UniProtKB/Swiss-Prot annotation:
Protein name per Swiss-Prot or TrEMBL: Ribonuclease BN
Organism: Salmonella paratyphi C (strain RKS4594)
Residues at the catalytic site: D68 (proton acceptor)
E.C. number(s) listed in UniProt: 3.1.-.-
Gene that encodes it: rbn
Binding site for Zn(2+) 2: D68, H69, D212, H270
Cofactor names: Zn(2+)
Presence of the UniProt keyword Cytoplasm in the record: no
Family matches, as PANTHER family: ZINC PHOSPHODIESTERASE ELAC PROTEIN 1 (PTHR46018:SF2)
């Protein structure tokens, strides 16, 4: 998996940062895909600067209904209708996202030419497509708001072909069954258990993508042990009280969460427009002082998971 940041500003766009939107590129060898997390104003325009087209999107996850995370959705849906074959799309989000989509399309005389499914969610597992699971966690914000934890299923360990050949097993269909962990019977009557010839399973990659939030209990469960945590750092540590009062987090609080959750890396986003480039570097330094494995996202930054 890899993350492509389309917008990294908080509240309003700036000359260098658009409002929130993140692509998750699912780099599976046989079942690749593209998901979108939040869809602030101008998201479809930002996508024009990437290799991804709205028609490629399979799922959109909305964290909450504040405009800087949502107002790009109607335009993207309409443009997707003109994007070629009518591939299905599912939108996940809090209560009200269905009404928002229906109302904006109706009042603007617009429609979609593809199968559109809308899932209004609550906290808990919301998706398992056979390759990965998505769990939603309710966060602390003035509007109903969620963060999403995406975890790939573990991959089977490598098959010890050399040991199997030494045991008299001929490569071919039997190897496929053994790699699946099955027990096979050889021509001489011997039974071979595939589990005995498999290396330990390879843990799937994991990412936690937070919506806007002040510190809360659910945040630790959402982030616990993930390879990558994407979290807002709207304001610096000196403005922590103001950030929390508005349902946001400071640099110090975000970095402390990353450390306590033992994540692999922290990626900072949702930066207040009050910070210029020098100010953004100060935010990054505040996080790295607590959690060194921190990166600052810019529009069009790409991070592997």
């Amino acid at each position: 998996m890899e993350l492509i940041f389309l917008g990294t500003s908080a509240g309003v766009p700036t000359r260098s940062r658009n409002v929130t939107a993140i692509l998750l590129h699912l780099q599976h060898p046989t079942q690749p895909g593209v998901w979108l997390f939040d869809c602030g104003e101008g998201t479809q325009h930002q996508m024009l600067n990437t290799a991804f087209h709205p028609g490629k999107l399979e799922r959109i996850f909305i964290s909450h209904l504040h405009g800087d995370h949502l107002f790009g959705l109607p335009g993207l849906l309409c443009s997707r209708s003109m994007a070629g074959p009518p591939h299905p799309l599912t939108v996940y989000g809090p209560q009200g996202v269905r009404e928002f989509i229906a109302t904006t399309l109706r009042l603007s005389g617009s429609w979609t030419d593809f199968p559109l499914q809308i899932e209004e969610i609550s906290a808990g597992d919301i998706l398992d497509d056979g390759l990965r699971k998505v769990t939603a966690f309710r966060l602390e914000h003035p509007l109903e708001c969620y963060g999403y934890r995406v975890v790939e299923h573990d991959k089977p360990g490598a098959l010890n072909a050399r040991a199997l050949k030494a045991a008299g097993v001929t490569p071919g269909p039997l190897f496929q069954a053994l790699k699946a962990g099955k027990t096979v019977t050889l021509a001489d009557g011997r039974q071979i258990n595939g589990a005995d010839y498999l290396a330990p399973a390879v843990a799937g990659k994991s990412v936690a993508i937070f919506g806007d939030t002040a510190p809360c209990e659910a945040a630790l469960a959402l982030a616990q042990g993930v390879d990558v945590m994407v979290h807002e750092t709207t304001l610096d540590a000196s403005m922590e009280e103001k950030a929390n009062a508005r349902g946001h987090s400071s640099t110090r609080q975000t970095a402390t969460l990353a450390r306590e959750a033992a994540v692999g890396r922290l990626i900072m986003t949702h930066i207040s427009s009050r910070y210029d480039d020098k100010g953004c570097q100060r935010l990054l330094a505040e996080c790295r002082a607590i959690f060194p494995a921190t990166e600052l996202a810019y529009d069009f930054s790409v991070f592997p998971v």
